[in-house]
Curated annotation (Swiss-Prot):
Keywords: Cytoplasm, Endosome, Lipoprotein, Metal-binding, Myristate, Nucleus, Palmitate, Phosphoprotein, Ubl conjugation, Ubl conjugation pathway, Zinc, Zinc-finger
Modified residues (Phosphoserine): 14, 25
Name of the coding gene: Rnf11
Localization in the cell: Early endosome; Recycling endosome; Cytoplasm; Nucleus
Listed name of the protein: RING finger protein 11
GO molecular function: ubiquitin protein ligase activity; zinc ion binding
Domain notes: The PPxY motif mediates interaction with NEDD4.
PROSITE patterns given in the database record: ZF_RING_2
Quaternary structure annotation from Swiss-Prot or TrEMBL: Interacts (when phosphorylated) with 14-3-3. Interacts with the E3 ubiquitin-ligases NEDD4, ITCH, SMURF2 and WWP1. Also interacts with the E2 ubiquitin-conjugating enzymes UBE2D1 and UBE2N, but neither with CDC34, nor with UBE2L3. Interacts with ZNF350, EPS15 and STAMBP. After TNF stimulation, interacts with TAX1BP1, TNFAIP3 and RIPK1; these interactions are transient and they are lost after 1 hour of stimulation with TNF. Interacts with GGA1.
InterPro entries: RNF11_RING-H2, UEC_component, Znf_RING, Znf_RING/FYVE/PHD
PTM annotation: Ubiquitinated in the presence of ITCH, SMURF2 and UBE2D1, as well as WWP1.
Phosphothreonine carried by residues: 135
Role description: Essential component of a ubiquitin-editing protein complex, comprising also TNFAIP3, ITCH and TAX1BP1, that ensures the transient nature of inflammatory signaling pathways. Promotes the association of TNFAIP3 to RIPK1 after TNF stimulation. TNFAIP3 deubiquitinates 'Lys-63' polyubiquitin chains on RIPK1 and catalyzes the formation of 'Lys-48'-polyubiquitin chains. This leads to RIPK1 proteasomal degradation and consequently termination of the TNF- or LPS-mediated activation of NF-kappa-B.
Amino acid sequence: MGNCLKSPTSDDISLLHESQSDRASFGEGTEPDQEPPPPYQEQVPVPIYHPTPSQTRLATQLTEEEQIRIAQRIGLIQHLPKGVYDPGRDGSEKKIRECVICMMDFVYGDPIRFLPCMHIYHLDCIDDWLMRSFTCPSCMEPVDAALLSSYETN
C-alpha cells in the first residue's frame, strides 16, 4: 500500500520535472548503451520417459532394452480404441462423467480412449498413465493382458 498523504516533495509537477531532467541527462529520450537481446534459439525438448513408476529419465539416458520396452508400450497403446466424448443425444445419461486421472469433467468433443475393461479417459491422460503403469486406474485390471487376449480370440 502506498502513502495517501501528499508531501510537498511528491506532487505531480515536481515528479514531471524530475523525469524530464533525467531524460535530458541520457540524451533526450534515448536509453543508455545496451546490448541487443540474444537471438531467439528454440530448444527442442528431449522426451522424458518413466521406465518404472519411481524413475524418470531423459530419452538419451535410456538403455537399448528400456527403449525397446517403451516402444512396445507405445505400440500397444496405439492399438487401444479411441473416440470422441458424446454424452448421448437422448439425454438418458444425465450423470456428469469425469476423467478419474485429471478429475476434469468430460466435455462434448473431448478425445477419449477406451480400455478393454470399458472405462474411458481423456486420451492424453490415459496415454501418459499407461506409459507409467499398464493397468486401468479405476479397476486395476492389466491392460496388456486383456489386449493380448483379445488378439488371441480372433
